[in-house]
Regions:
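FAD-dinucleotide binding site
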Residues: 2-497
């Protein structure tokens, strides 16, 4: 397998073969925890699938790019973009229109920590721009919007929170129910253990449980053999980034890899070859962390931004943080209310809702995801300044999704928690073994970029089958024993071939 130009452009496909109220209320809003395509089987008896692996007893998946109120899982830097574009998007317009959300975070984009901090930042800007208590609208009830709404209410403002969905939380969403030992988070899941002080304090105040997962990596080839450590892939990416930084113009990561020999790495050794190691990094670390394919991502700056994967998993349900922020707050909440137009040129701000109703406020905080802004779902009058428009176009909407599987019994014996599977089809998949968190056989895969698009095109049955194929290298044949009758009528365990 050579890392050709086509491979560089499509490496992120490699994950799985596949592979976040019409009326006004003054009550404490309680975000639901929707079950996004979960399925639970009536008995825990494992049923062998086509791969010889047992069928999962519970299943859940996300599709953030297909969500009309998300249009992506996060944001990334296209070629030529820098963090200055995020800062430009975050700037207030005429002290009337303010922006928040992960895409406006210069230091932690794509994370709950970045979104939460951006909501607090925008609330502070609104408070400083006004004179006393004002009527403020917050568009979007994700973590940025709810953080802004709570901070504004604490500062004495009259706040109305406008959310397009029936449920609050935005890209905080989970599959729950009896099929899962803890909520299967389809959007936000990880937080860092180090310096997320603001977010950590809020999570602790909300009483949400967390688990520090030891990230122990293990890579396996199609035959199940453990692959030894190699720096070939990371060295190739580092060389490409260094070359891109030295160029006067904008170049993609794919172009930088071609210029530095990434398309000519040796293929001898199959899954252990330098070429395969580079393809694995592009399909997992790059595609999942940034939601972008190599030809979409800035070669110079795209990898500067920290990955949204930390080493602490939220196990008590991230939706509880939204509940906590809005609990006992005198905040108007408009559910199932899309905003189609924001007019801000006459000293006030007018919001036109999809229902045809209008809302007049002093200022507005817009927290809708980048993909929604790019789609033009909200018309601004007057049009956004060119600096904001350029920033919106310079950033890319990330595409990353999750698939969760629960089994009746584990079919693996490795204690590693971060798996990279190189299956017989030559595809790479990143899996997390979450048994240390819950004590239950739960696995979670993450896919990004074009792999996420392929996942979205699969129905549940095809996706489960693809997931099991990608897990085959980690199966322990001794744990896949099937009962076979003996001459005495007693069952005898025979390993499944």
């Amino acid at each position: 397998m050579s890392i050709s130009r086509r491979t560089l452009l499509t490496a992120s496909v490699s994950g799985l073969s596949l592979l976040g109220l019409a009326a006004c209320t003054r009550t404490t809003p309680t975000p639901a925890t929707p079950t996004a395509t979960p399925s639970t089987m009536p008995t825990p008896t494992p049923t062998p699938g086509a791969t010889g692996l047992p069928e999962p007893t519970a299943f859940a998946r996300s599709d953030w790019a297909g969500d009309p109120f998300a249009r992506g899982s996060g944001s990334f830097l296209r070629p030529g973009a820098t963090t200055a574009d995020r800062e430009a998007l975050a700037r207030p317009i005429q002290d009337r229109v303010f922006f928040a959300g992960e895409a406006t975070s210069a230091d932690r984009p794509g994370t709950v920590a970045g979104a939460y901090a951006s909501g607090l930042r925008a609330a502070g800007e609104v408070d400083r721009a006004g004179a006393g208590s004002e009527r403020v609208a917050v568009v979007g009830a994700g973590i940025a919007g709810t953080a802004a709404a709570r901070a504004l209410r604490d500062a004495g403002h009259d706040v109305v929170l406008v959310e397009a969905r029936a449920d609050l939380g935005g890209r905080i969403r989970a599959a729950g129910g009896t099929g899962w030992p803890h909520p299967a988070e389809l959007g936000a899941l990880w937080i860092a253990a180090d310096d997320d002080d603001l977010l950590r304090d809020a999570i602790e105040a909300a009483g949400i449980t967390r688990y520090g997962l030891a990230l122990v990596a293990e890579d396996r080839g199609p035959d199940g053999a453990v692959l030894g450590p190699s720096s070939a892939g990371s060295d190739a990416v580092a060389a490409a980034r260094a070359w891109a930084l030295a160029q006067p113009g904008a170049v993609s990561l794919a172009a930088a890899l071609r210029e530095t020999g990434g398309d000519a790495l040796p293929t001898e050794g199959g899954a252990a070859s330098p070429a395969a190691r580079l393809a694995a990094i592009l399909a997992t670390d790059v595609a999942i962390a940034h939601g972008a394919a190599p030809d979409e991502l800035s070669g110079a700056r795209g990898l500067d931004e920290p990955a949204p994967v930390g080493n602490v998993a939220v196990t008590g349900g991230f939706a509880g943080l939204v509940q906590h922020l809005l609990r006992d707050q005198d905040i108007d909440v408009l559910r199932e209310s899309t905003v189609s137009r924001i007019a801000y040129g006459n000293g006030r701000v007018g919001l036109r809702l999809g229902s045809g109703e209008s809302l007049s406020v002093d200022r507005v905080v817009v927290t809708v995801p980048l993909g929604v802004l790019q789609e033009g779902a909200i018309a601004f009058d007057p049009a956004l300044p060119s600096s904001h428009d350029v920033a919106i176009r310079a950033l890319g909407p990330g595409r990353a999704d999750r698939i969760w599987l629960r089994f009746a019994e584990p079919f693996w014996s490795t204690t590693a928690t971060v798996w990279t599977s190189y299956d017989e089809d030559g595809r790479f998949t990143r899996w997390y073994n979450l048994m240390p968190i819950s004590g239950e056989p739960v696995l979670m895969a993450e896919v990004g970029a074009e792999a996420a698009e392929r996942v979205a095109a699969m129905d549940d049955e095809a996706l489960r089958a693809a997931a099991l194929r990608s897990l085959a290298p980690f199966a322990d044949t001794e744990l896949l024993a099937t009962p076979e009758p003996t001459t005495t009528g007693e069952p005898r365990a025979t390993p499944t071939p």
